[in-house]
Amino acid sequence: MIKSSEIKKIVNDYSDVKIGVLGSHSALEVMDGAKDENFETTVFCQKGREGPYQRFNRIADQIVVLDKFKDMASAKNQKMLRDSNTIVVPHRSLTVYLGYKTIEEKFKVPIFGNRKLFQAEERTAKKGQYYLLEKARIKYPKLFKDPKRINKPCIVKVQEKKRPLERAFFTVSS
């Protein structure tokens, strides 16, 4: 795990902070909010996926086009992020494309939040997001493991086969 003291040292040298994000579907909202707060933004896109950021040119001050999303973690790009005083705002796609090991051990760029908690966001982790919600006494939707037990209106979330990061939703009542 990258020591927080290493990241603190990097952040202490920052002056005008910029916001960086991996350019998947979640990035548009993150960047729109960053612009609302008057931050400069950088988005890292996989080749062929830069279109939305070019169309909504208000939200991206800099678009970095990569061969693969995982290239965001290259030494060259990490240096560029640090040199430009960038804090990365993470979302699910960052952990999927860069991987936990890379983020925890190699990605020496400040991240908004706690890189130790990313794995806890997994639904399948022993002490994952549902465990944390229960510990915090935060209500969350009931999970039905057997569809035969559904006895009231429910929203069903289905992971798409061809696009593993995407989910389809529909409603049922029984």
Regions found by a protein language model. Name each.
Residues K3-E37:
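N-terminal phosphate-binding or glycine-rich loops at protein starts, especially the Walker A/P-loop
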